[in-house]
Amino acid sequence: MIGFKSFFMRTIIFQVLAILLLWGLLVAWVKYWYYPDMEKYFDNQQRIVAAGIANILDETGTDNIDYRGIIKTIEGMYIDSINNGMQDEIDYHPLFVVYDRDNRVLYSSQTQGEPLRLPPSVLSGSVNYAGANWHLAGSWKEKRQYRVIVGESFNDRTTLFGNPADVPLLGILAAIIVTLLFTAYFSLRPLRQIARTISDRQPGNLSPINVSEQYQEIRPVVMEVNKLMARIDAANQREKRFMADAAHELRTPIAAVLAQLHLLTQVTEQQERREIIGDMQQGLDRAASLSRQLINLAKLEAEDFPLKIEAVDIYAEIGKCIAQHVPYALEKDVELSLDGSEDVVVSTDRRALIAIFTNLLDNALKYAPPGSRIEANIRSLAPLGCYITLRDNGPGVSEEHRSRLFERFYRVPGTQQTGSGLGLAIARNLADKIGAQLRVTEGLDDRGIGFIIDLPESYRPQTESEPRP
C-alpha cells in the first residue's frame, strides 16, 4: 500500500524539527555559556567592591576613623549604582562583611541576628545565611590585614539578569509553530494554483504553460511539464501524419487493384487475365512494401525506439552489405567497390547502421544505368568517429531538389523507377536515432550524387535542444 505523502506535512515537520533543534541550542547556550558568564561578571563586580574596601582599610586602619561609616557609604553607593542600572526600582540588599586578621567580624550589613561566620581561607562561594542563599566574592589586599566579603542573594541576582522560568518558552515555541503552519500553507499556494491551471485545461489542450508567470522555484517543474506535453503533442502529430500518409499512399494501389479486379471479372481471354493478375500482384506488392515502410517509419519516430549499442567493425560490416548486393550489381552491369580505413571500430547500433547504408545502396543501384560505378569509402576520424561515403556517377539529382530528398514520400520529378519516397526518410531517421548525421555530397566524375554518414566514435543520442543539421 502506498503511504500517505504530503509536501505540506513534510515541510512542516522539517521546519519544526529545525526550530526545535535551534531552540535546544539556544537553551543549552543560555544554560551552559550565557548564565555562567553572567555569574562570573557579577562575582567580579562584588570582588572589585570588596577589593576597594580592603584597600581603604589597609591604608587608613580602623583605630582613628569611622571605618563603619566609610563602609556604609560605599555600600549605599553600590546599592544606588545597581538600582540606577535597572529600569524598575528593586529592593536590593547586598551583604557586606569585614573580618580582621584574626577572623573577627568588624562590620556586617546584616544587623539582625548572628553575623556571617566564614573560615579564614574562604573568599568566594555560595552559602545559606539568614534564610537565603548567597553568592559570595571577597578580597584580601597586600597587607592581608582585612578580609572583605560582598554577598548577593540568589533572588537579587536572578532579578538582575532575569529568571528563565519567567520566560514563557513553551508559549513562544507554540506561537512559532503556529506561524510556521500559516506561512507553509500560504507558501504552497503557488503549487495549488499551478495544479488548478493544469486540471482546468481541456483534454486536447497541449499548449505550453506560461513559465514567466510562475515563481522561480516552480519554473523547473512547469518547464518539464511543458516538455512532456510537447512530446505528447509530437506523438499525436506523428500518429495523425502516419494515418494521413497511410490513407493517402495506400489509396492509389488499392484503388488500382480494385479496378483491375473488376476488370478481371469481365475478361475471358486467358492471356489478358494473366496480365491483369500480374498487374494486381505488382500493385499488392507495392501496397505491402509501402505498409512495411510506413510501419518502420512510425517505429523510428517513436521515442522508445530500441537500440543495441555495441562495438562495430565498420569496414567488415559495410563490406558484407556490398557483397550481398554484388549479384544485383552484376545483373545491371554496375561496378561496386569499397576502400578506405580498415581498422575503424565505433560503438553504435549495427542493424541501424546497416539499414542506413542498405537504403542508400539500394537507391544507388536502382537509378544506376549500365556501365556506371558506385564507390563506398570509409575514412577514419579517430578519436571523433568516421565518415562512410557512398557516391555514384549515375543520373544524379539537381541542386534544386537535393534539399527535399529526405522528406517523406518525396520523389524527384521525372523519375521513371517505382518507389514510395520513404527510403531516404527512413535512413535519415535511423541516423538521428544513433546520433549520426546523414547529408548529401557530390557524386563521381562531376556526375551522380553522393551521401555521407557522419558516425560518431560512440553513441550519443540527439537531445531536444540540438537542431537537426
From Swiss-Prot:
InterPro entries according to UniProt: HATPase_C_sf, His_kinase_dom, HisK_dim/P_dom, HisK_dim/P_sf, Sig_transdc_His_kin-like_C, TCS_sensor_his_kinase
The encoding gene: rssA
Family annotation (PANTHER family): SENSOR HISTIDINE KINASE CUSS (PTHR45436:SF15), SENSOR HISTIDINE KINASE YKOH (PTHR45436)
The name this protein goes by in its record: Swarming motility regulation sensor protein RssA
One term under GO cellular component: plasma membrane
Enzyme Commission number(s): 2.7.13.3
Molecular function, one GO term: phosphorelay sensor kinase activity
Catalytic activity: ATP + protein L-histidine = ADP + protein N-phospho-L-histidine
Key words of the record: ATP-binding, Cell inner membrane, Cell membrane, Kinase, Membrane, Nucleotide-binding, Phosphoprotein, Transferase, Transmembrane, Transmembrane helix, Two-component regulatory system
Primary location: membrane
TM helices/strands, residue ranges: 12-32, 167-187
All copies of domain Histidine kinase, residue ranges: 245-459
Topology of this chain in the membrane: Multi-pass membrane protein
Gene3D superfamilies linked to this entry: 1.10.287.130, Histidine kinase-like ATPase, C-terminal domain (3.30.565.10)
